[in-house]
């Protein structure tokens, strides 16, 4: 379910590159829509990096993104990837605890 939620978000950030959803709601509302129960959550978004290695390098070199990845309180991760018609890659990591 978490990967499905991340996939939804990857498609959404292709429309609007933001932690806010295209309909104006918080990005984490996708978790509730998918029936995911959590006490804490985080989201990393990226676009343009064509390989998983490159997107991870970018996130690990960014303090805020790295903090999410290394947060020991998060117990689950879902990853979404979407390649738009122009060939731009969109990536999402969703974390929950």
What kind of region is each of these model predictions?
Residues 2-53, 69:
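Short, surface-exposed glycine/acidic/tryptophan-bearing loops
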Residues 46-97:
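Disulfide-stabilized extracellular recognition modules
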């Amino acid at each position: 379910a978490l990967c499905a939620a991340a996939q939804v978000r990857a498609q959404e950030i292709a429309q609007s590159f933001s932690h806010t959803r295209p309909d104006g709601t918080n990005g984490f509302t996708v978790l509730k829509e998918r029936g995911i129960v959590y006490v804490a959550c985080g989201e990393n978004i990226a676009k343009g990096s064509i390989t998983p290695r490159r997107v991870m390098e970018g996130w690990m070199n960014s303090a805020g993104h790295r903090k999410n990845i290394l947060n020991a309180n998060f117990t689950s991760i879902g990853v979404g990837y979407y390649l738009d018609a122009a060939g731009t890659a969109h990536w999402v990591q969703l974390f929950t605890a």
